[in-house]
Amino acid sequence: MLSKKMLRDIAKHKTQFLSIFLMAFLGVFVFAGVGGESVGLEVNVNEYYDATNLADGWIYSANLDDDFVDKVNNLNPTKDRERQLVMDSVADFSNDPQITLHFLEKNNISTFYLIDGEEFNVSDENGVWLDKKFADSKDLKVGDNISFTFNGIEIEKEIKGLGYSPEYVYHASDASVIPDFNKIGFAYLSYKAFPLSDVPYNVLLVDFDGNAGDYDDLLSDKLDGKYNSFIQQSEHVSVSQFSEEMDQHKMMGDIFPVVFILIALLILLTTMTRIISHQRTQIGILKAVGFKNRTIMFHYISYGLWLVVAGSILGLIVGPLTLPNLFYPSMSSTYILPEWKPAWSMTFVYVAIAMILMSVVVSYFAVRSISKENPADTIRPKSPKVSSSGFIEKLGFWKKLSFNARWNYRDAKRNKFRGLMTIVGVIGCTALLVSAFGMYDGMSNLKEWEYSQINHYDSKLVIDEKASLSEIDDVAHEVNGDKIMESAIEIDSGNSKKSASLLVLNDTKLVTPTDYDWNKVHIADDEVSISQKMADL
């Protein structure tokens, strides 16, 4: 009998109960959907790193001779190491794309992830294994030839394979934060493909046991002055950028569902309070004919319970199957992973269970007061609340308000919770709108700040390291440019060490360092300026 009554009540108040179902569904749908996307990113990238054995760290030096490599290998935590020569080149296309060449001594660490063609062969001096994203943008395929120019030397190789690299999950040029795969790429070659007899290796990839910070300290202690810098895995540009992206998605997935869940619970509380108030007589009759308070309470608690259970289950199923597929196409245009698939986490179930339990608690608070009344009092209509005059009604402007304004104020005063729900709902919706537009404005301001306020140049030329000062002056005069120096450095604050980029400026107007308020930062000859993020680290 009570089940039929519940169904009739739900049909009678279908709009309110539909809202409860939809809010419960949306809350779990967004949490499980965005969570499935962010957890999927983490699972996919970790599987990718494991499959390719991403390096634990990179040691940079201008001279990685056999003696230095042996000393690194003899350090107790070191499990494996291999040298590479990493250098910039220009591919033979009309837009002069920049291709980072990797000449490999071995291929055991940060290995090439093959998509098409044959596996990387360290003994093959005629082949090149090319970035698939770049190859697709240029309509290149396995078997085609491609030419690269570096340091005045041109080499032509046959494309033996197309694929990805774990070091290039994120890869953008210095002048852009959004990758343009038509202008940048990477290529893996054997050390035998290098045109000179001696390969000037400049990067040593290492796998090691233990903490990266401890390994950094050990390098500094044993090999101080024999290398330029050490970058641990978490500080690598590609790794850190993708990690920050995952953190942003996790934060978004944690915040946005809260709004829907709170609104669902508020709607449930006000709806149940209104239904119970209207059904006082029915509740009194149920008590009079022998129904226990426990039975009546469960009857009304079940109104929201089954709707929230249905919405939560549907959200758990639909969310991870649909929302990630909306994010991944845009993500794949910026980041490179061999696989994009959502993942599941028990956290989604815990949130759904928590929401169901909260709906039970909310319904309980709505029905508990009337359950304590005896049948005779429950059958009688509830006496209206007596609203006393507040301080606002004693102010002079009160009489100047219209009748509708005074009515609305007194009605909100008598139904404080309903008014609170309205305020919270408006705050939540406004916060979502402001956050969305704020994010858009923030990205627009970032672009304006980076490319109008700080950098004023159209292009940047990378000078050969062997060029003399007079040759550099001639180039600068020829292109009407200014000279700057960029280098990788290691900052030691006593408590921690961090890898950073050093930028040395002459009296140039093409680069203007600024603070957060876009004010120009003046740096004296005996001063140095560091970024706020580096200062925080």
Regions found by a protein language model. Give the residues of each.
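Membrane-proximal extracellular/periplasmic loop immediately following the first transmembrane helix
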Residues: 47-90, 104, 214-218, 452-494, ...
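A short beta-strand structural signal in non-transmembrane regions
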Residues: 55-62, 134-135, 183-233, 242, ...
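Peri-transmembrane interface segments
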Residues: 15, 37-38, 42-45, 50, ...
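Short beta-strand boundary microenvironments
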Residues: 93-138, 177-180, 186, 449-453, ...
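Alpha-helical transmembrane segments
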Residues: 16-21, 26-54, 252, 323-330, ...
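Small-residue-rich transmembrane alpha-helices
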Residues: 269-274, 279-281, 305-337, 345-372
